[in-house]
Amino acid sequence: MIVLFVDFDYFYAQVEEVLNPSLKGKPVVVCVFSGRFEDSGAVATANYEARKFGVKAGIPIVEAKKILPNAVYLPMRKEVYQQVSSRIMNLLREYSEKIEIASIDEAYLDISDKVRDYREAYNLGLEIKNKILEKEKITVTVGISKNKVFAKIAADMAKPNGIKVIDDEEVKRLIRELDIADVPGIGNITAEKLKKLGINKLVDTLSIEFDKLKGMIGEAKAKYLISLARDEYNEPIRTRVRKSIGRIVTMKRNSRNLEEIKPYLFRAIEESYYKLDKRIPKAIHVVAVTEDLDIVSRGRTFPHGISKETAYSESVKLLQKILEEDERKIRRIGVRFSKFIEAIGLDKFFDT
């Protein structure tokens, strides 16, 4: 398999630059304003002129303005960015029917039946980059490798506005040398846990008993890392986008008090159910944004549809789990529903 990964460079801020060329060359910061007080909220993304000063996604707006008071600060306009993203994704579909849209600014293409080798893949990547730049004035970074994970790693190495191939020999080298924190899907907290076990490189996961690894980071992540370290990872491109509906709300103050958080959580559920229309979810995730803007979530999938009453009770259990497992205060709380079935009016399809 040959996978081509496309990552839109500093996407939200770049769209703002395209729409307003006078912003080019200036530090631009796109923000999610929470409305708690003036400048409350967090940075969604920043262009490279801002990043070189330390302004990056996730930091509080107040902190960003201390670092870079003269930058251009703009509110996030998700609908505008989504329109541009949709057009670019349609361009990508011209190059492969097998496309997995990972997010608003990332996509994987299986180009195995389009090219014969990595040299042709590289040329196709250049063609895609030039086409997107010509049509949308947006620069992207392209990573190419034998699977999705190493294609993403290749793009991370080539940012911004670059292109890189990680061939099979370089994959073997990276398995030996790649820092565990640089593996996609392994966040800082998980990386810290692994390093306490002596796992500093990807290959180190092979030197520890699987049950011990599973006990530390969970079965799914343990299997994921082992398959990568053995050079056996081959998850296919999934052409269907996982659809979910949810809502996250900002609380008046950071808290770890269950009773204080519950009304905000229930509000998120109520607003999410309003958007479900006739779809019934089988999966629920409670999503918490912590005081340091990290994201923690816990979820459950049911064999049948979830009624609103079940969503209320299950969400409290999931919230309790988050509070038990994480000592940080919660800043924002929300819920995400997925794995939908169509409503047919029969009670037996609910898990109550």
UniProtKB/Swiss-Prot annotation:
CDD domains for this protein: PolY_Pol_IV_kappa
Positions of Mg(2+) binding: 7, 105
Intracellular or extracellular location(s): Cytoplasm
Entry GO MF terms: damaged DNA binding; DNA-directed DNA polymerase activity; magnesium ion binding
One Gene Ontology cellular component: cytoplasm
Principal location listed in the UniProt entry: cytoplasm
Cofactor(s) the record lists: Mg(2+)
Cofactor comment text: Binds 2 magnesium ions per subunit.
Reactions catalysed, as given in the entry: DNA(n) + a 2'-deoxyribonucleoside 5'-triphosphate = DNA(n+1) + diphosphate
Keywords, in A-Z order: Cytoplasm, DNA damage, DNA repair, DNA replication, DNA-binding, DNA-directed DNA polymerase, Magnesium, Metal-binding, Mutator protein, Nucleotidyltransferase, Transferase
Enzyme class: transferase
Site (Substrate discrimination): 12
Residue intervals of the UmuC domain: 3-187
GO biological process, alphabetically ordered: DNA-templated DNA replication; error-prone translesion synthesis
Assembly information from the UniProt record: Monomer. Interacts with the PCNA heterotrimer via PCNA1.
The protein's role, per its UniProt record: Poorly processive, error-prone DNA polymerase involved in untargeted mutagenesis. Copies undamaged DNA at stalled replication forks, which arise in vivo from mismatched or misaligned primer ends. These misaligned primers can be extended by PolIV. Exhibits no 3'-5' exonuclease (proofreading) activity. It is involved in translesional synthesis.
Entry remark concerning the domains of this protein: The catalytic core consists of fingers, palm and thumb subdomains, but the fingers and thumb subdomains are much smaller than in high-fidelity polymerases; residues from five sequence motifs of the Y-family cluster around an active site cleft that can accommodate DNA and nucleotide substrates with relaxed geometric constraints, with consequently higher rates of misincorporation and low processivity.
Similarity comment: Belongs to the DNA polymerase type-Y family.
Protein name according to UniProt: DNA polymerase IV
Organism: Saccharolobus solfataricus (strain ATCC 35092 / DSM 1617 / JCM 11322 / P2)
Gene: dbh
